[in-house]
Amino acid sequence: MHRIVYLERDSIIAEVRRPDFPHHWAEHAKTLQSEVKERLAGATIAIVNKLQIDAELIAALPALQMVAVAATGANNIDLEACRVRGIVVSNIRGYASHTVPEHVLAMLLALSRNIFAYRQAVADGSWQRAEQFCFFDYPIRDLHGATLALIGSGNLGSGVARLAGAFGMHVLRSERKDALSVRPGYTLFAEALRQADAVSLHCPLSAETSKLIGESELRSMKPSALLINTARGGLVDETALARALQEGWIAGAGFDVLSVEPPRDGNPLLAPELLALPNFMLTPHIAWASQPAMQALADQLISNLEAFARGEPQHVLT
């Protein structure tokens, strides 16, 4: 009988049905990293979201057969160590194909039309003091006709492309940063950044993509460009982004992720002066979290467990 331990149950707000095979189920609302080893002792299946499962931990868990990641990103799992041990690692795919693209477009619309600046102008009485029916203190740009560069063209990037196309945007699919050749339908990374009125990140975080967007990339973008990140905080040099926003290298940014989550003191993107800027949006990693998306995630999570128990594992990363 499988022993299943769910370490971060509170990370999704959805009904999680029990698998259809014989098992013992234990779940914890939250788990500290220091508690993982003890709680997974004897487990054959671990369900995790953001907790680290590294080689040292894997070596201490001889019964472990499967790590079910309740998310798409699995940069918190030592996949090679799991592969060597024969541990199956599965992730969730396709569940956020509507909710994340909608969040991206919401950020693009709010920033391109300076919604927050104009809302504040009403709140502080600027409109009420105006001498005509409206005022134009902040530029308003249409998405129609603008160029959007996508870095990452998988399920989520393609979803953003579909919505952007409906708004009349011209979509560029960026080639990998260090690619020696360009695939048909793609644009050189550096050229995509230079042409873009907005850049949206949808690639996984890895050693190759860490700080993919740094000072040189930000300076190469148009001063009127926007940067959107709903993928992973580590894709961007956060110190460089803070400078870019304060010094006007780019026009604005919308982020749903930070390099360390939950964020702690010291992250440059949490500086009060930055959060006060009307051209910077920061949301608490909720682009994926519409109710339908979370339920789809929960359903697929259990489906992954059942497929593994049948000897037909799906969505395998190892």
Model-inferred region functions:
Residues S224, T230-T318:
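Rossmann-like dinucleotide-binding domain for NAD(H)/NADP(H)
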